[in-house]
């Protein structure tokens, strides 16, 4: 899929030529899972799969939206007044961004026809919703001279998720999608929002995305429950030590103060947040140093913690990761994203990718009963206007 596909679709849908094209990628997180709402570090990158849009103006004072993925045409009419309440549809993400940007001072002076199509598997944990949010933010900011900085668009997207969609997500997804750079990952301190770009040099290895094809509904999953558990654990720790977030603690500091947390489940949740943050720092340094063996071990250790301390995997993800680690040429593997379905990643020697996909796919099909899908990820730039 590319911009030509959406410009052709735009003409078929609206009967005229598109004036602009845009793209927003999906994302994978190399390591640093469920740390973004705990004041820790994350290490994501944008990928070449994503969401495209072809856009043209109209004189209807309306946003006419068509999604090729859902094969639905939608009409948002109140671009000069108040928007409708959310309806549990894909249009909520467009409308949510428009509402937040309008509140922040955006001035929508005319209508738009927007044709959207993407190649991110829906519900796969590659951030299709955040990709759509950042796509919309880029479109509206560009075509209405919004003047918003990229980090402002990131915060608008988080606000849409938290206040409009109803998901207590952190900042990582929108940040990675808006701020991504080709062939680089971003080490982001979510506590301070300081970040640095680090080259992803894998040598003879590639990143293989493994899609369980089990949909995960973020708002309906236990994502919000995990965040609440971490907040409870932090509150207990704060009764005995001065700490603002779990991400501020070292492993030793956490181990010395676990007696403050009375619930063994909460200890497990907080331990993941603390230790995952430290793993992320170690992994980013290992990648900088060209120590891919250590990097792979830390990626795999993250997966173990997500399965046993944070308990966000499940039989589908566990089957993929366990069998991935048995294959020749694999440096590391783990789930990526919020969990409860969705995707995992593996770092695989390029010479072994074909056998890897055949073997892991066969075992998955035999155990789960349906196919997993595999993609070799290219690390891409963030959201942008294409023409």
From Swiss-Prot:
Top-rank lineage group of the source organism: Bacteria
Residues involved in ATP binding: 67, 123-129
Places the protein is found: Cytoplasm
Enzyme class: transferase
One Gene Ontology term from the biological process aspect of the record: galactose metabolic process
Keywords, ordered alphabetically: ATP-binding, Carbohydrate metabolism, Cytoplasm, Galactose metabolism, Kinase, Magnesium, Metal-binding, Nucleotide-binding, Transferase
Primary location: cytoplasm
Binding positions for Mg(2+) per the UniProt entry: 129, 161
Cross-referenced HAMAP family: Galactokinase
Protein name per the record: Galactokinase
Organism: Lacticaseibacillus casei
